[in-house]
Amino acid sequence: MGVKDLSKVIGDHSPNSIRLKEFKGYFGRKVAVDASMCLYQFLIAVRQDGSQLQTESGETTSHLLGMFYRTIRMIDNGIKPVYVFDGKPPQMKTSELEKRTERRTEAEKQRNDAVELGDETSVNKFEKRLVKVTKEQSEEAKRLVTLMGIPVLDAPCEAEAQCAALAKAGKVFATVSEDMDALTFGSPILLRQMIASEAKKLPVKEMNLNQVLKDFGMNMGQFVDLCILLGCDYVSTIRGIGPKKAFELIKKYECIENVLETINQTKYPIPQDWQYKEARRLFLEPDVMNCENLELVWKEPDVEGIVQFLCVEKSFNEDRVRGSLTRMQKGRQAAQQARIDSFFSVSKVVTSETTKRKNEEKNNLKKRGPSLGKKAKK
């Protein structure tokens, strides 16, 4: 879920923090990608006939197709991704995960009813609600991107939190995810719609956390408390408090403790055993690996390894795969050349400026006339 209605609240109160940019505008940038979110999106992006891509034996390959082509698109545009996968979910997320399981069970019943009625549109809708990324699919995705030479990290806990930690440490420019809680975890920049299909021609939606805090008139602690009131994966919401009310309460009372002391708890009943302090701690002190000494290395793709995996094992079209890998390698070379050209152009500018300064100094000396240490000729 991320944080309920946070995108709307930011749109209402901090429109300047949102920029729509072209994909190619991130040339030369390193980004941390919430891989688990990507896989989910690839799996729900079913074909027009409502089915997922599969091998002849019935194995789903939508996740591999999506990961392969989205990665190539990024590399082709000079973007260097790091894929971060979810680790063990925090204990406080158990309730949310149980709710998701219940929703999938209900969706399965509704899907079966729709099948009996021959309602194809409803069948497709409920099929998407049944999607869950399996451990095997995650491992296959890791294998693929590793063969492609892309760094892979297994987060101790939440992938978005680890992405945010990488961004805060300056290892990457931004977090790539559709989950808004990447901002709540402190990612300075969040990029949404970056992994959308190229055919959709959607701009990348860039969100700037510092601008959000400035426009909201809040510090990070207050922003986290706002996100908890809006609704997150760790605790229930307070019935009757929607996005507008939540924003007003934090603006006025600054923290959840003050809100609870002030509001009418008959009108706004507090959930039993509401562990908002623990939720706050999970956002402000998430379980992440230390990024300070972490070295991210992008390697040459293992072309034959990729062909073996995708074409031999997963029945992908070899000509298309090899053609795409050629495009990827050209993209890598272009990015490297651009960085070299950039280096020399900067050096040229510096040299030019130095020469210009020396010439100006010579001209100034001529204008001043003879130096003080010499006698002027009569």
UniProtKB/Swiss-Prot annotation:
Listed Basic and acidic residues bias regions: 95-113, 354-364
Cofactor(s) for this UniProt protein: Mg(2+)
Chain intervals for the UniProt region annotation (I-domain): 122-253
CDD domains: H3TH_FEN1-Euk (cd09907), PIN_FEN1 (cd09867)
InterPro entries, alphabetized: 5-3_exonuclease_C_sf (IPR036279), Flap_endonuc (IPR023426), HhH2 (IPR008918), PIN-like_dom_sf (IPR029060), XPG-I_dom (IPR006086), XPG/Rad2 (IPR006084), XPG_CS (IPR019974), XPG_DNA_repair_N (IPR006085)
CC terms in the record's Gene Ontology section: mitochondrion; nucleolus; nucleoplasm
Interaction with PCNA: region residues: 336-344
DNA repair recorded as keyword: yes
Record text on cofactor binding: Binds 2 magnesium ions per subunit. They probably participate in the reaction catalyzed by the enzyme. May bind an additional third magnesium ion after substrate binding.
Positions that bind DNA: 47, 70, 158, 231, 233
Pfam families: XPG_I (PF00867), XPG_N (PF00752)
Region (Disordered): 90-113, 348-378
Gene Ontology molecular function: any one: manganese ion binding
Family designation: Belongs to the XPG/RAD2 endonuclease family. FEN1 subfamily.
Subunit structure: Interacts with PCNA. Three molecules of FEN1 bind to one PCNA trimer with each molecule binding to one PCNA monomer. PCNA stimulates the nuclease activity without altering cleavage specificity.
Function: Structure-specific nuclease with 5'-flap endonuclease and 5'-3' exonuclease activities involved in DNA replication and repair. During DNA replication, cleaves the 5'-overhanging flap structure that is generated by displacement synthesis when DNA polymerase encounters the 5'-end of a downstream Okazaki fragment. It enters the flap from the 5'-end and then tracks to cleave the flap base, leaving a nick for ligation. Also involved in the long patch base excision repair (LP-BER) pathway, by cleaving within the apurinic/apyrimidinic (AP) site-terminated flap.
Name of this chain's protein: Flap endonuclease 1
Gene name linked to the record: FEN1
